[in-house]
A protein has these predicted regions:
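Enriched for short, Lys/Arg-rich terminal
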Residues: 1-29, 56-57, 65-86
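A short, surface-exposed loop/turn module that caps and links secondary-structure elements
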Residues: 30-55
Length: 86
């Protein structure tokens, strides 16, 4: 199985830069990189009423879209679990 291409929305990149600790940012980047090989990893959840998925990374959530035809994953939002879905 070929890897998917990773794309990160500019708003998601800004949200990643705003995350407080280097350790949390590093953990999130590793989770995002893992999406290239497996866009639907164990523990991912499809969001209700949207064509988006989310994965957990500690106290943070990564929201992304999958384009199977174009073989790409686009990260659209990264945020703390309390406010990421608003």
């Amino acid at each position: 199985m070929a890897d998917y291409r990773l794309l990160i929305a500019s708003s998601a990149a800004k949200e990643l830069d705003a995350i407080g600790t280097k350790k949390d940012r590093r953990r999130i980047v590793v989770r995002i990189q893992g999406l290239a090989g497996e866009p639907r990893p164990l523990g991912c959840q499809k969001l209700t009423a949207r064509e988006q998925y989310r994965i957990r990374s500690g106290q943070y959530r990564i929201v992304y879209e999958i384009d199977d035809a174009g073989r790409s994953v686009t990260v659209v939002k990264i945020g703390h679990r309390k406010g990421v879905y608003r």
